[in-house]
């Protein structure tokens, strides 16, 4: 899921920044859009209009990001989509059959696209704007490093994300976060622009909006990451229901064993495994991790 969240957050930041830049340019050179400054008492900001604007931009950006998620993932990772009716290798056929079988067990009416991408990293992700237009992709490194039961557990976990509707839920949360990001960045930019000469206020405010929006987006990702960690436990339970608790636990232990071997071989954490956030992080960086600590996930699964 780490890849899925990374794609979504990256796309969201790009979409939101583009919307704000276009809106700022249009409102600067036309009467459309206008200013949220009233010149009244206090900061002189029309908070009601700014909040409506922030809601529209925030949720528009989130849902555009959702709509682009599957396409973005396939392009960025160079995913080879597998045709279930076409010629496939034995390993490819295994992945397709497992995804379809587990999807049917999860009650999905439309089978997800299935893909493999060439990478040494041990990873898999599910993405897509809806249950009807979803994608489950696994890395070649995962297929090389894991046995069939572990691969099935990983696939079950990803199918559970689709069945649980995690992308849509994440989008709604991101829309709320975006709303506050837009609102607060505008207020902060207006305040900053008051400290420069009037002829420079527009360009300073424009630049400040971009800077504050990126800064607040990073802070907002803490909220999104916390929700992602919470949903990972649900996906583990869903994967256990679909493939069996033993296979789901075996998949998590296999991931941990791979990480431990990597540390033993070179004395450092494998960056590819860190992409999955399966090892957990300490200190402040733990706030930005999209996955809980792997030992904690195994312990919770075994307590079911």
Curated annotation (Swiss-Prot):
Lineage: Bacteria, Bacillati, Bacillota, Bacilli, Bacillales
Subcellular location(s) of the protein: Cell membrane
Any single GO BP term: proteolysis
Keyword Calcium: no
Chain positions recorded as Zn(2+) binding sites: 157, 161, 232
Gene Ontology CC entries for this record: plasma membrane
Gene (UniProt): htpX
Transmembrane intervals: 5-25, 48-68, 172-192, 203-223
NCBIfam families according to UniProt: PRK05457.1 (NF003965)
Named cofactor requirement(s): Zn(2+)
EC class (word): hydrolase
A UniProt-annotated Pfam family: Peptidase_M48
EC number(s) from the headed UniProt entry: 3.4.24.-
Protein name as annotated: Protease HtpX homolog
Organism: Halalkalibacterium halodurans (strain ATCC BAA-125 / DSM 18197 / FERM 7344 / JCM 9153 / C-125) (Bacillus halodurans)
MF term (GO), any: metalloendopeptidase activity
InterPro entries assigned: HtpX_protease, Pept_M48_protease_HtpX, Peptidase_M48
Membrane-related topology note: Multi-pass membrane protein
Cofactor binding mode and count: Binds 1 zinc ion per subunit.
Main localization of the protein described in the UniProt heading: membrane
């Amino acid at each position: 899921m780490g890849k899925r969240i990374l794609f979504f957050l990256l796309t969201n930041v790009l979409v939101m920044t583009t919307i704000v830049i276009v809106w700022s340019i249009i409102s600067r050179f036309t009467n459309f859009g206008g200013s949220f400054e009233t010149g009244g008492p206090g900061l002189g900001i029309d908070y009601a209009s700014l909040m409506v604007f922030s809601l529209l931009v925030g949720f528009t950006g989130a849902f555009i990001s959702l709509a682009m998620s599957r396409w973005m993932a396939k392009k960025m990772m160079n995913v080879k989509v597998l045709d279930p009716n076409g010629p496939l290798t034995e390993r490819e056929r295994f992945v397709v059959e497992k995804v379809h079988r587990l999807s049917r067990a999860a009650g999905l009416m439309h089978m997800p696209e299935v893909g493999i991408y060439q990478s040494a990293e041990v990873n898999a992700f599910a993405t897509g704007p809806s249950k009807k237009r979803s994608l489950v992709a696994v890395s070649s490194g995962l297929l090389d490093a894991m046995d069939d039961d572990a691969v099935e557990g990983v696939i079950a976990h990803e199918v559970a994300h689709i069945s649980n509707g995690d992308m849509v839920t994440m989008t709604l949360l991101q829309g709320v976060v975006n709303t506050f990001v837009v609102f607060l960045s505008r207020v902060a930019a207006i305040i900053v622009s008051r400290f420069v000469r009037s002829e420079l206020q527009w360009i300073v405010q424009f630049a400040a909006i971009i800077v504050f929006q990126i800064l607040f987006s990073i802070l907002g990702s803490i909220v999104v990451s916390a929700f992602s960690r919470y949903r990972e436990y649900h996906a583990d339970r869903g994967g256990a229901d679909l493939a069996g608790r033993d296979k789901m636990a075996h998949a998590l232990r296999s991931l941990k064993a791979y990480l431990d071997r990597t540390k033993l071989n070179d004395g450092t954490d494998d960056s590819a495994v860190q992409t999955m956030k399966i090892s957990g992080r300490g200190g402040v960086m733990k706030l930005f991790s999209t996955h809980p600590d792997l030992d904690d996930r195994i312990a919770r699964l075994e307590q079911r």
